[in-house]
Amino acid sequence: KYALYSKSPKQVLKEGTGSNADINFILISMLKDAGIPAYPAVMSRRDMGILPYSHPSIQKLNTFVVAISPTDSTLVYLDSSVENGYLNVLPPVLMTNRARIIAPDNHSQWVSLENVGSNLLRSSVKAGISSEGVVTGTRETVYIGQYASRLRNKYRTAKDSTEFASKLASEENIQVKKLQMEGRTHFSPQVYELVEFEKQYTVNDQFIYVNPLVFLHVSESPFKQSERKLPVEFPYTDQVSLTINLTIPEGYTVDEKPENQRLQTSDGQVLCRYIITQQNNQVTLRYSFRLQ
């Protein structure tokens, strides 16, 4: 899939398939024909080791992405072999901290691809709780950057929309009543999704036990390997913003709710907020997570 050198463009076009190097070289030629400066940004993939700072070697290079210069002061990056990518939405394995743009007239330069693009999931849930413990409502979500790429990939690998909805229901432990998406097939950085759902919670005597975070951000710890190699490296920068509005059933009151929390790492790179409020029969949860 990933390569540094290309076959003949005629051969690639005839076969209709090729490595990312094959397709990226064709893209560079097309952009230059259109008058848009474009150059290879060569690198060592993240899973193949870091390029040595003191003695960088061509033997350590194993692939490249396309650096596009739409203006004199702007660079954007694209790997044209990715079906669900976009400008500055690269496979995480290519988001290296050290790549070399190969440009003429002494304009070559070192660049970091670690923080290119914006990756954001913004979701709003409006739902009501019945006396039987059934939460019924809608979830509106905007997926941006890597989140949009992942959603498109999930849809593409499903057999059809029914299978996609079935997997969503299984993952979130809900019944999907309606599913609507916009922008899934567009070359754009975001996808909009609307889900109408039902979710059953536990009812015991006169109590209903509801997790106000109806759709979990993380369902299990990512740090469960028996061995861990340092340093720990996250795939990309990340932002999640969730707002949940729940209406409690008539005749019920909130007996107990989670405490507000604000957690932050010592270097400020990771921040999580959990703020829950109540006004009459309305419970509102605002959850945010940021990884820089």
Language-model features: where?
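A sensor for short, sequence-defined functional sites
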Residues: 1-292
